[in-house]
Amino acid sequence: ASIFQYFGTKQALYEYLFYYCSSQMKQAYDLSTLDANADFFDRVWAASVMKVKNLKENPYIAAFIGSAATEQSPDLKDILTSAMEEGKRFTEVLVLHEQDSVKFKRPEDAKLVFQMLMLLADGIVSRFENGIDYDSIMSEFESILHMLKYNFYKEEYLL
C-alpha cells in the first residue's frame, strides 16, 4: 500500500519500474567493445551475450519485462509501447552502423534484417512467462544469426 502512496497509481509505478529496468539493461552494454567490432552480426551477438549476462544476474528484470509485456491495461500499454520503441531505437544505434549496409548483397536489407531481429526478440520475450532457458535461446539465436549472415552478406564478407 505504501508503494502506491508513493507512486500514486499503478501506471506511475509500472512506468518507473519499466524505465528503471531499461536503464539497468542499457548499463549492461560495454559500448567500447561493441564499437570496436566491425561486423553487424558480431555486434548483435556480443550485445546479446551482454544482455543475457545481465538478465541472468538480475532475474527480476526478466520477470518484470515478461509480466509487463502481457499487461492488458490500455494506459500501461501506451507507456510500455513507448518505452519499448525507445529501447529499439537505442539498440539500433548500438548495433546497426551506417557502414554495415555495404556488406549486404542488397544494402537496403541491413535495416530490414535489424527489424526482423527485433521481431525475433519480441517473440523471445513472450517465452519469459514460461521460464527462461537462456543457454538454449542463445544457441538457437546464434544459429539464426549465422544463417542470416550467410544468406544476406556478400561473399567477400563471409571469410
Pin down the residues of each PLM region.
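Helix-turn-helix
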Residues: 1-12, 16
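Short, flexible helix/strand-to-coil boundary loops that buttress conserved ligand/catalytic motifs
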Residues: 17-18, 29, 59, 65-66, ...
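Amphipathic alpha-helical packing segments from all-alpha helical-bundle domains
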Residues: 23-32, 42, 74-101, 111-119, ...
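Short, flexible helix-adjacent loops and helix caps
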Residues: 26, 30-37, 67, 100-103, ...
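Short, hydrophobic secondary-structure boundary micro-motifs
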Residues: 62-65, 77-78, 107, 159
